[in-house]
């Protein structure tokens, strides 16, 4: 009788981490990492059941932060540094949702890339 025994993987306890928030025009992606950049947890508005234009709403960003931070708290994350990027309207509500999660925030950094006359912007929308 050969039985295979599955060993449960130990969860690492990480107390200090970085939150990367990418707020684009179409979606919000949140990633919790440790200091070295190894992913602890991640979530996106599209992965949380929001489809189409609803992915780019501030409420979708709030739900995304809640889901990702719940996973990160299981690993013992308490102190975070925030790196937020992108042109989306969800930035402010994502920050407020993070402050409501009882993390100790050490720094907030805006890592949005600024084009120095880069690619041509999309044409104007006609409704």
From Swiss-Prot:
GO terms for cellular component: ribonucleoprotein complex; ribosome. Keywords: Ribonucleoprotein, Ribosomal protein, RNA-binding, rRNA-binding. The keyword Ribosomal protein applies. GO terms for biological process: translation. It holds the Pfam family Ribosomal_S11. GO terms for molecular function: rRNA binding; structural constituent of ribosome. Signal peptide: none annotated. Part of the 30S ribosomal subunit. Interacts with proteins S7 and S18. Binds to IF-3. Located on the platform of the 30S subunit, it bridges several disparate RNA helices of the 16S rRNA. Forms part of the Shine-Dalgarno cleft in the 70S ribosome. Belongs to the universal ribosomal protein uS11 family. This is Small ribosomal subunit protein uS11. It comes from Rickettsia akari (strain Hartford).
